[in-house]
Amino acid sequence: MNLYFLEADKPLTKTYAKKNGELIKSPYPMTWEFTSHQEQSSDLSSMLSLLNKHAALGHCLLKGVIARPLVRESRAGSTNSNDATDWLCLDLDGLPEHMETKTPSGQTLTTPLTLDLFLNEMGLQDVSYIVQWSASYGISNSRIRAHVFIQLDKPYAAPLIKQWLIQKNHDVDLLRNTMELTKTGNSIRWALDISACQNDKLIYIAPPVLKNIKDPMGKQPRIALVKGKYDILALNGGINTTEKNKQLTHTRINDLRDTAGLIKRKFNYKVVGGTEVLTKPAESVI
């Protein structure tokens, strides 16, 4: 696995502070110039060491491959959206705090959603993974906020992985039931981030700066390897086509619009400059 870490002129992390009982949050710094660091990882164990190394330095991880080394410069145009990758990132930031489970007698129970329960719902309970708990995890609530890294059996094109993520959002009841409309009412807020596969995606791995706040992780490592029965994941079993996922998404949007008392929408697209765009979108407020 080729891994690319990016360094900026300041640590790429969030800051949380308590002042007079009020929680003050400082977002990730806005920065445009980066220096890249290329690393080679043969398995998740070596990837774990590299993640810990660069997290301690305040670097972030780039999902894709950089075409050329960066030295204190913009990363614009440095990645190819169609490049293949042999590792998967699950960005968990939109999951519910609880889930419903059934007892053998058929009774419905409300259970706190743990990472193990989520991976079981995804069918990934037997696969080894690295979990990196996000800077915001445990600050305001116990909701899962993490990145999960899984080694793949071979390189897959990033657009194909995106279709796999979209399909999972539709097929896994936990994710499907968590879907919401965006403010415009014309698209979906995905429970499992479908952009985490994009080759230009920055994955923030550095621990937060905490001032007058106890670290919610305690002595638990923020980045850890969890061994499973299988060390790699094959994305087999059939991945939906783009058209199939588009139909599922349109149906789900209209179902949610109906629940919200909105009229159904008809979706039409055209290709502009090689990019498919929605024609005649509804009016929205920005």
Regions picked out by a protein language model, each given a short descriptive name:
Residues 1-146, 150-168, 262-270, 274-282, ...:
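Signature for HUH/AEP ssDNA processing cores
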Residues 3-8, 25, 30-56, 72, ...:
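Catalytic "initiation/cleavage/transfer" segments centered on a nucleophilic residue
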